[in-house]
């Protein structure tokens, strides 16, 4: 089944949102490291005004618009992401990081029960297909430094400043 997409202009550039008939499947930044914009994928169709996928995308657009307007701090959307069981554990943990705060990759690994899994947590974080909504931008280095982000470090910095997250940048 082809995915349906829509475009959303935001302060961090035009996002492309993708959905199946039941859930949001992706959020892509203009500078996404995950390949070409999804609108170039074979079989993907732009959202119309009705249908199950269009309804998911309308909800996602509205909630992201509210996030950028600072009137929403959490998201309530059905999500569908392909990944391993471990990646899903990491992505679920990311959703528990409160708006306006950050955590480190090491702290997230420890929270998941394996303090030695820092690198694996970082890899799973980087594979998150639904950034912002699954807030991978809230994960920073051990000393508070900004580290990799699919939308670019400038976008990560903007999102954290937008949320009022106080971070100490490492030397």
Regions found by a protein language model. Name each.
Residues 1-116, 162, 166-171:
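Basic nucleic-acid-binding alpha-helical/helix-turn surface characteristic of O6-alkylguanine DNA
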Residues 15, 139-141:
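Active-site and channel-lining beta-strand-loop segments
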Residues 118-121:
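Helix-turn-helix DNA-binding helix
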Residues 126-131:
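Terminal helix-turn-helix DNA-binding modules in bacterial transcription factors
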Residues 132-139:
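Short Lys/Arg-enriched helix C-cap and helix-to-coil transition segments
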Residues 142-171:
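…primarily DNA-binding HTH/wHTH and HhH modules…
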């Amino acid at each position: 089944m082809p995915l349906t997409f829509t475009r959303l202009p935001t302060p961090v550039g035009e996002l492309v949102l993708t959905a199946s008939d039941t859930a949001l499947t992706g959020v892509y930044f203009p500078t996404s490291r995950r390949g070409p914009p999804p609108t170039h994928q074979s079989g993907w169709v732009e959202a119309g005004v009705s249908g199950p996928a269009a309804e998911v995308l309308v909800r996602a657009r509205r909630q992201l618009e509210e996030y950028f307007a600072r009137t929403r701090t959490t998201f309530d959307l059905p999500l569908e992401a392909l990944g391993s069981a471990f990646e899903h554990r990491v992505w679920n943990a990311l959703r528990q990081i409160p708006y306006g705060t950050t955590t480190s990759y090491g702290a997230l690994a420890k929270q998941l029960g394996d303090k030695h899994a820092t690198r694996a947590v970082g890899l799973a974080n980087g594979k998150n297909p639904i950034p912002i909504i699954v807030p991978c931008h809230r994960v920073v280095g051990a000393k508070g430094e900004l580290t990799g982000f699919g939308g670019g470090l400038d976008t990560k910095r903007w999102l954290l400043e937008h949320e009022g997250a106080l971070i100490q940048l490492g030397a």
